[in-house]
Amino acid sequence: VLDEKKRKENVDFMAEMIGQCALFQPKCLVLHPSSEPIADSIRAQRITNASRSIAYLKKYADQIGAQLCIENLPRTCLGNTPEELLEIIKDIPGVKVCFDTNHYTKGTTGHFVETVGERIGTIHASDFDFVNECHWLPTQGDIQWGKLMHALEGIGYEGVFMYEATKDHENDNTRPTPERVVETFNKIINDYKNQK
């Protein structure tokens, strides 16, 4: 937010929440860099404010031993390109990126991985139509999962591959069953192997 008093209140609340997370001993904490909509006229100031807030919250994540990751977001949100996301975190050592495959609508997943590289700290995996976020099971949209897996291998990524899919697009957008999650994950692995 632009209002400094409200920004400080929000960040203090988030710092308190991070402190309470210590009970669960998280390895990673994922934060969004903004809400939306964000007009172009205030974007630069919002980026500055987000960077300040993240730097402040990083100290609290460090206190509980958690890796702080900032998630890419779609539409007019901050961090809607890998370049902008890196701009937000560039002066904050140790902060990484949560790559949400379903949020990057301005390019390919390969471009995102190549640009962010080793700063990818965790992944939220779901598929979409390259227009807007859909949260479909992976392999049900337009992402080329085998290519994405090779790109991740190319940067040495060995972290979490967390499904964040809420819809089984091939079954009338019903909630995915565990069996369907396994089925789509096996498709990803087979696609990866077939591209070697």
Task: Identify the role of each PLM range.
Residues 19, 27, 51, 55, ...:
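Histidine-acidic metal/acid-base catalytic patches
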Residues 1-96, 106:
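Active-site acidic/histidine proton-transfer and metal-coordination neighborhood
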